[in-house]
């Protein structure tokens, strides 16, 4: 076993000297196991740089409090490896793949995969573009997700990012029998705890593996925890042929953690103080998230935008990789429209006639045109009232309000709060429902009948009850 000694400690960055000229490889995991009067210490470092002939610079995966120079360090001879397979479902892990829930240790012989690996080879990639049906009307109609695609989820605090994530996990599990992996990267521990309990209550946890590296942890853990989650997802894709959902909350914290250690590793900062390797690190992570001939990983990434500045290097680098964006809007929550997805700001490169078909594309564009015209007319309505509008514009407003309400629906995972049964709406029902509204087939039904329903048949039922 190759052993070295700690020579320098700079917060989360630790230098280790190896005698005999046998240096551990880049990305190898080094461990410290020792006991002293302050208790036992069990640390893992990852090799980041080689300094000269006998010293490596490493990044710690947990706090270095109590570590002293001269401490003996062992080279494990391999990268950090984490458990993979069905044994991970329903469990919660840290960056090293240790179980941190209260359900006991994993079996000793559990299969482990290294967190660093190459993106799939070019010839393994799947070229066919396939839509991932979510059962959520506003997403499927206006900003559809692609299997193996990357989706950015934008929204402030309390607008429903977590509930939307839970519903997606639920629908993929129930309708497609799919598996989800949730990576909590640098977010609040309280939110992770709440999510775990909510998912346990709704029964979704049985089809989900969860990995956390939260705000209070050192940057090494926050930077690598996304790779831990991704490695678990890759196993389900490559070994079991699954279509996996990978949730990363929040992708900005991955970049932020990299920038924290970058200067300590001796790199010159680049724009806005970010690490010079920002685009490379992001690319290495994102390129592994893709569809292959065996299965797919579809990634939904919450994106925090610092100071709402979309030109900041961190969100700007993320955008380059996204196939679709789902924007959540507080204004819609205030109107009681859930999910509060902004139908005009959300985009998808899959919304083209070649991918979704001519009818779907036409209906989606007409819905957006109607809503856009309604938005333009709102100032006139606020100042002069509805009576000043032309008959044509009155009809636009009339239909736009019905469309706006019909874009809302009840979620399965929110049943315990709302008391209303959740609904999963197939894409073809969604398209035909909106097409009929645009054609004026339901102009005579009260607009409240369209609120928080599934398919168009529920609207007709509601209207009958209201008119009875």
UniProtKB/Swiss-Prot annotation:
Main location: membrane
GO molecular function: ATP binding; ATP hydrolysis activity; proton-transporting ATP synthase activity, rotational mechanism
Source taxon at top rank: Bacteria
Name of the top EC class for this enzyme: translocase
Enzyme Commission number: 7.1.2.2
Keyword Ion transport: yes
Family label: Belongs to the ATPase alpha/beta chains family.
Descriptive protein name: ATP synthase subunit beta
Gene name of the encoded protein: atpD
């Amino acid at each position: 076993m190759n052993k070295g000694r700690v020579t320098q400690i700079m917060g989360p960055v630790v230098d280790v000297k190896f005698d005999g000229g046998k240096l551990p490889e880049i990305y190898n995991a080094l461990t410290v196991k020792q006991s002293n009067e302050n208790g036992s210490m069990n640390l893992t470092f990852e090799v980041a740089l080689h300094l000269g002939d006998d010293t490596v610079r490493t990044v710690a995966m947990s706090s270095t409090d109590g570590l002293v120079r001269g401490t003996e360090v062992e080279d494990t001879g391999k990268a950090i490896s984490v458990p993979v397979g069905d044994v991970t479902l329903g469990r919660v892990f840290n960056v090293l793949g240790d179980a941190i829930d209260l359900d006991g240790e994993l079996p000793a012989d559990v299969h482990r995969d290294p967190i660093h690996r190459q993106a799939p080879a070019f010839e393994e990639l799947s070229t066919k573009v396939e839509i991932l049906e979510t059962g959520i009307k506003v997403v499927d109609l206006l900003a559809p997700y692609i299997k193996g695609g990357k989706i950015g989820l934008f929204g402030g605090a309390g607008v429903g990012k977590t509930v939307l994530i839970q519903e997606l996990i639920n629908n993929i599990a129930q309708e497609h029998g799919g598996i989800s992996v949730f990576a909590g990267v640098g977010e609040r521990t309280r939110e992770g705890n709440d999510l775990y309990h909510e998912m346990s209550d709704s029964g979704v946890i049985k089809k989900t593996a969860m990995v956390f590296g939260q705000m209070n942890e050192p940057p090494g853990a926050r930077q690598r925890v996304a790779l831990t989650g991704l490695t678990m997802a890759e196993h389900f894709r490559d070994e079991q042929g699954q279509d996996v959902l990978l949730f990363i909350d929040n992708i900005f914290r991955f970049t932020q953690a990299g920038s924290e250690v970058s200067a300590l590793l001796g790199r010159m900062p680049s724009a806005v103080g970010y690490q010079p390797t920002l685009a490379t690190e992001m690319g290495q992570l994102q390129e592994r998230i893709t569809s292959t001939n065996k299965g797919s990983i579809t990634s939904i990434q919450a994106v925090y935008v610092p100071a709402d500045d979309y030109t900041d290097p961190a969100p700007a680098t993320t955008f380059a990789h996204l196939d679709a964006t789902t924007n959540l809007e507080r204004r819609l929550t205030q109107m009681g429209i859930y999910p509060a997805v902004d139908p005009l700001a959300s985009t998808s490169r899959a919304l083209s006639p070649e991918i979704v078909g001519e009818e779907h594309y036409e209906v989606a564009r007409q819905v957006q045109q109607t809503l856009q015209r309604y938005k333009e007319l709102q100032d006139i309505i606020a100042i002069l009232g509805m009576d000043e509008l032309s008959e044509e514009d009155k009809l636009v407003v009339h239909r736009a309000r019905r469309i706006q309400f019909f874009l809302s629906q009840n979620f399965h995972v929110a049943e315990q709060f709302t008391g209303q049964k959740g609904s999963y709406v197939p894409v073809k029902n969604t398209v035909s429902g909106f097409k009929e509204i645009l054609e004026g087939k339901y102009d005579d039904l009260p607009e409240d009948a369209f609120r928080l329903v599934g398919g168009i048949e529920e609207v007709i039922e509601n209207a009958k009850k209201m008119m009875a």
